[in-house]
Amino acid sequence: MTEAVEKHIKKLQRLDKKDELEVEHLLKVLKTPSKEYIVPLREMAEQWKNDPQPQEGVLFVPYAEWVGAICIYLEEGTQGLVKAIDKPKEFFHIVFGVLEEIPVSEAFTAFLEIAKTFSTGITDEQEDFVKKYAYSLCCISHQLKGENVGKDLHEAFVPILKQIISFAQSKKNETIMCNATVCFQAFGDKSDIEYLKSLTFTEDYYKNTGKTIIKRIEKKYA
C-alpha cells in the first residue's frame, strides 16, 4: 500500500471513530483512484454491517453500499457500475452518485450504456430511476456548459434527453423535465433552440429554464 493510500485510509478510520464520517469523504477516493483502496475499504464496510441499526428518527446513511459502489468502480470501471446498477433494487441512487464524481468522459460512456435500459420506452416503474439519471447528468453538464462537446455527443444524448422530457411531460413531473432541459447546456447546439422554445413549465421555479439554456447555447456558439 502506498503512503498516500495508507494516509487516506487512516483519515477515514479516524473520522469513522469520531462519528464524523460523511459520504463526501469516501468519494474523495475517486479523485486518486487506486485498487489499493479496495481491501481496506471493504474491511471498513464489513464492520459497518455489524453496527447496530440507528434509532428511529435517526438518518441512516448506507456507508457500506457507498463503499461497495466505489470498490466496483476501482475494480471493474464503469462497466462494473452499469452491470450493478439495479442490484439491489435501490442501488442506482448510489451508482449515479459515484458517476457524478469520476472523469466526465468515463461517466458519459456509462450514461449512454444505462440509457439502453429505457431505450424502448420509459415505464411508470422507472420514474424514480429516470429522475436520478437526469439529475446526475444535469450535475455533470454544469462542468461543460461553456464547452463544445462535439457532434457525436450531441447526436448521442439529445434523443435521450428528448425522450426523458416527453416522459416527464406525460407524468407532469417538472423536476425531471427541468433537469433534462438543463443538460442541453452541455449537449445542445443551435439546432435545438426551437425545441427548447417549445417547452413550457407551469411552476414559477422552472419557468425561465428554457430561456436560460438557450442563452447559454447562443453564447457558446456565437
Q: What are the functions of these language-model segments?
A:
Residues 1-12, 32-51, 72-86, 104-121, ...:
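Amphipathic alpha-helical scaffolding segments comprising HEAT/armadillo-like alpha-solenoid repeats
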Residues 20-33, 53-75, 80-83, 92-106, ...:
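Structural detector for internal amphipathic alpha-helices that build alpha-solenoid repeat scaffolds
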